[in-house]
Amino acid sequence: MDGVAVRLARLKKEAQREWRRKWRQAAPSTPAEWKALAGEALIGFLKIALIIALPFVVLVRGSVFIYEHGRTPVWMAVLVAAFLTGGVVTAYAVWIARRFTKRGGKGGRALVMPLAKWVALPLVVFYCGYSLLYLASVHAKSAPVRAYYTSVHPLLRLALSTAILVDRDILITDTGRQPDDYGRMGLPESLRSRHYRGADGWVHAVDLRTAGRGTLKNWSVQLYFWSMGFDTKRHVGTADHLHVELN
């Protein structure tokens, strides 16, 4: 038994020595090679990030674009964007399935409808339903703010829920208001606040906490909402916050 243990220890050392030799051969040896490796790693990371983000961008930015430029009802905009998102998810699912099953051509096309029905549709429906109906209490400053969540415009709810997936520290400090709320906050009454319910019955604005979150986080969240088609403004009312609204 001792002889076996000795041989195993020797084999382990030889394997480690061979691994270190191969690593030295494969590892970049010059600054130019390290720079090239870093560039390839960055490109790979960006590709992965783009692949992950694309369905959410299609859903959120697509619904806002259709709503604003197509002059369509909000639920129609959500439905069309969800359909397009389902197409993206189906394409991903087909690609993954073909990689594992080695089915291509007509065999790959035969996967489209089953994967659309049993993978893409449930995922998109679940995500939209979750985003539109649920807000965790940890992301609302108070119970009244959370209670107002379903009164917020559906497109803003989709955008908020998607932002929360990435930034788990987002805190909504205000949603719907009444005219007399401004007096209680020591502010002049606003006649055209987007925090009021609009003619369509929805609240078109929310405020997000910025205190204690850091400049980069706040800037990233503001950039996200702006790129998704929302108006954003960082201002001081009763407290420093980020105002996000849908026109």
Where are the language model's segments positioned?
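Membrane-helix interfacial "entry" motifs
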Residues: A36-E40, K106-P114
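N-terminal post-signal-peptidase region of extra-cytosolic proteins
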Residues: A147-A159, L187-H195, G229
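Short, structured coil/loop segments at alpha-helix boundaries
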Residues: A36, E40-I43, R71-W75, V145-R157, ...
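Active-site acidic/histidine clusters and adjacent loop/turn architecture
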Residues: W118-I172
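N-terminal targeting leaders characterized by basic, low-complexity, disordered sequences
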Residues: M1-L84
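Active-site-adjacent substructure of cysteine-protease-like catalytic cores
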Residues: D167-W202
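Catalytic cores and adjacent binding grooves of peptidoglycan-active enzymes
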Residues: I51, P55-R99, R109-Y127, E189-N247
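Membrane-helix boundary connector in multi-pass membrane proteins
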Residues: T101-G105
